[in-house]
Amino acid sequence: MCTKLFDPKLDYIFKKIFGSEKHPRILISFLNACIKPEHPITEVTIKNTEITKEYMEESFSRLDVLATTQDGEVINIEMQRADEKNMVKRSLYYWSKIFASEYKGKGRYSSLPRTICINVLDFKLLDEEKFHNVYILKNKENNNMLTDTL
């Protein structure tokens, strides 16, 4: 019997592992390990991964995995194998589109949920010793956090 393991860094395999509505426990475990939330994630709903184009000139974008937690937090997980030298801006673009899309239909800024982007990279992006890094918006003068919505 020949056992062949599939590379989980391949888009199709990654999406089958983490974006499956049939096996949410895998995604929940991954998110709890990455985010380390105060209250563990116990439930996720997989969402449509297509980013709606606002203008004709925009390119089509599809996220790898997009989910909502039981608390309404929206989480995007991207797997990137190749360094296309645009990951930071690409991640910010995806985050902004996801965040803005949550406003539509609700009409209240206060209803915007916490939105988290997790990038799983098969290359070194940052000059950091640790492979797991978390970034937030904060005041660069006094280090006070502006919000945990991002």
Predicted regions and their residues:
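Elongated, amphipathic alpha-helical interaction scaffolds
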Residues: 1-150
